[in-house]
Amino acid sequence: MPRATLPAEARLHRPSEFAAALKGRRLARGAFFIVSASPCAPADDQPARARLGLVIAKRFAARAVTRNTLKRVIREAFRARRLALPAQDYVVRLHSKLTPASLTALKRSARAEVDAHFTRIAR
């Protein structure tokens, strides 16, 4: 059975890529997340495709379990909509402190917000 993963070429890796995307346009802002983007440079052998970077700061989500859960939820939302998004480098950044909640409630609210952001960007 094929695995539904986010391939390495769909992620930002270098600090310069993150910096360029964070300096780019802010596309969406919600209760927890800001989505910034900049045009990506296509490789010689590959067409330009949407790529994702995540910035989840420890000061906003103190527990490692919470940070990893947020990253997992955001990556899954991006993977589901990656082909519908314009070919840009996206950075999703947590911008406010999370209120204490169960992981189930956190997953639900984070997924709803990120889905709304990516749906708006895809239009």
From Swiss-Prot:
GO molecular function: 3'-tRNA processing endoribonuclease activity; ribonuclease P activity; tRNA binding
Any Pfam family hit: Ribonuclease_P
Catalytic activity: Endonucleolytic cleavage of RNA, removing 5'-extranucleotides from tRNA precursor
Keywords attached to this entry: Endonuclease, Hydrolase, Nuclease, RNA-binding, tRNA processing
Keyword Ion transport: no
Keyword flag tRNA processing: yes
Enzyme Commission number(s): 3.1.26.5
One GO biological process term: tRNA 5'-leader removal
Catalytic class of the enzyme: hydrolase
GO cellular component assignments: ribonuclease P complex
InterPro entries registered for this protein in UniProt: Ribosomal_Su5_D2-typ_SF, Ribsml_uS5_D2-typ_fold_subgr, RNase_P, RNase_P_CS
Disulfide bridge partners, by residue number: none
Chain's role: RNaseP catalyzes the removal of the 5'-leader sequence from pre-tRNA to produce the mature 5'-terminus. It can also cleave other RNA substrates such as 4.5S RNA. The protein component plays an auxiliary but essential role in vivo by binding to the 5'-leader sequence and broadening the substrate specificity of the ribozyme.
Subunit structure: Consists of a catalytic RNA component (M1 or rnpB) and a protein subunit.
Family, as annotated: Belongs to the RnpA family.
Alphabetized NCBIfam families for the sequence: PRK00038.1 (NF000707), rnpA (TIGR00188)
Annotated protein name in UniProt: Ribonuclease P protein component
Encoding gene, per UniProt annotation: rnpA
